[in-house]
């Protein structure tokens, strides 16, 4: 069966729309003649802006509404920032494609008062905004003299808050800044020795309905093998730790020849406990590498740290 139309579900945010239109354009180039439509909608994570993400819970926070459209037959695929896509998907859905990754690093963005400072030079009392527990824990570990403040809203809103003086600096995903045309706001890319990035950060994931080979054949034209191998190892690591995108779990992955090297981290919210290790294996079996690394961190006390975090969030 040859498809002549494809329906894409996506979030309404500006970044999501930019990413989805890119996917649409690439698919149209690869499959001339196909009619592709986009249905944009708000997700729970888009609507709740006055509560920290970690307190809401993150299972499908930015994906459930899109997945529902596919499950009832109103959409064929959904385009996600892969870091927002849970590692366990609803029955009947699958991760069909992972696109080539942008730089997955975190980025320091500063207001003009700090334009001559690098991260390690920020003075005591500097107010740093982030909504990510992963970034918070790692930066507290390395820079306990800074003041950390939650920040919500879309990327443009966050930059406006920064420029208005509500924060001295922000930590944001470099890929998101680049995709929205704010690459010039990247003051410094944070080294992975300081802040391991989120699982899947910088890549797009295209989710689709299982048992629809005609859809899978269309979207596989955007698959990037190396990115897919790296992200599958990262997602396996996260899945084995039973974590989500709102817990202090960070990763870094790279491919060297036939080997895939995965580094993973789990940290306490105050940054005082931080466990980090690496695993090397054959890139043809990326999920095994992620699972083995997770088990190694478990043996070093990772689950005890995560349980303390889950208990703390529930109390709040």
From Swiss-Prot:
InterPro entries: HemC, Porphobilin_deaminase_cofac_BS, Porphobilin_deaminase_N, Porphobilinogen_deaminase_C, Porphobilinogen_deaminase_C_sf. Pfam families: Porphobil_deam (PF01379), Porphobil_deamC (PF03900). One of its GO terms (molecular function) is hydroxymethylbilane synthase activity. Its cofactor is dipyrromethane. It is an enzyme of class 2 (transferase). One of its GO terms (biological process) is chlorophyll biosynthetic process. The keyword Transferase applies. The modification S-(dipyrrolylmethanemethyl)cysteine is found at residue 245. GO terms for cellular component: cytoplasm. Its EC number is 2.5.1.61. Pathway: Porphyrin-containing compound metabolism; protoporphyrin-IX biosynthesis; coproporphyrinogen-III from 5-aminolevulinate: step 2/4; Porphyrin-containing compound metabolism; chlorophyll biosynthesis. It catalyses: 4 porphobilinogen + H2O = hydroxymethylbilane + 4 NH4(+). Tetrapolymerization of the monopyrrole PBG into the hydroxymethylbilane pre-uroporphyrinogen in several discrete steps. Monomer. The porphobilinogen subunits are added to the dipyrromethane group. NCBIfam families: hemC. Belongs to the HMBS family. HAMAP family: Porphobil_deam. This is Porphobilinogen deaminase. It comes from Prochlorococcus marinus (strain MIT 9211). The lineage of its organism: Bacteria, Bacillati, Cyanobacteriota, Cyanophyceae, Synechococcales. The gene is hemC.
């Amino acid at each position: 069966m040859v498809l002549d139309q494809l329906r894409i579900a996506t979030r309404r945010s500006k970044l999501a729309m930019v990413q989805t239109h890119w996917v649409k354009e690439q698919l149209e180039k690869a499959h001339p003649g196909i009619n592709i439509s986009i249905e944009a909608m708000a997700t729970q994570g888009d609507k709740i802006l006055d509560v920290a993400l970690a307190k809401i819970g993150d299972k499908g926070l930015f994906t459930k509404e899109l997945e529902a459209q596919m499950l009832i037959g109103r959409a064929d695929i959904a385009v996600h920032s892969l870091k927002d896509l849970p590692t366990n998907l609803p029955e009947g859905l699958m991760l069909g494609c992972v696109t080539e990754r942008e730089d997955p690093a975190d980025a320091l963005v500063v207001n003009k008062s700090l334009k001559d400072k690098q991260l390690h030079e920020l003075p005591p009392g500097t107010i740093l905004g982030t909504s990510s527990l992963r970034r918070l824990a790692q930066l507290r570990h390395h820079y306990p003299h800074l003041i950390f403040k939650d920040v919500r809203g879309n990327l443009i809103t966050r930059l406006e808050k920064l420029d208005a003086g509500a924060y001295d600096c922000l930590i944001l995903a470099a890929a998101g800044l680049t995709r929205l045309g704010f690459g010039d706001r990247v003051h410094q890319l944070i080294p992975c020795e300081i802040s391991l990035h989120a699982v899947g950060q910088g890549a797009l994931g295209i989710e689709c309905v299982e048992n629809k080979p005609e859809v899978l054949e269309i979207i596989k034209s955007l698959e990037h093998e190396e990115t897919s191998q790296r992200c599958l190892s990262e997602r396996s690591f996260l899945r084995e730790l039973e974590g989500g995108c709102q817990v202090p779990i960070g990763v870094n992955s790279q491919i060297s020849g036939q080997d895939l090297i995965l580094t993973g981290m789990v940290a306490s919210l105050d940054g005082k406990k931080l466990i980090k290790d690496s695993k090397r294996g054959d890139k043809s079996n990326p999920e095994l590498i992620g699972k083995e690394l997770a088990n190694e961190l478990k043996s070093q006390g990772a689950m005890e740290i995560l349980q303390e975090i889950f208990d703390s969030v529930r109390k709040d």
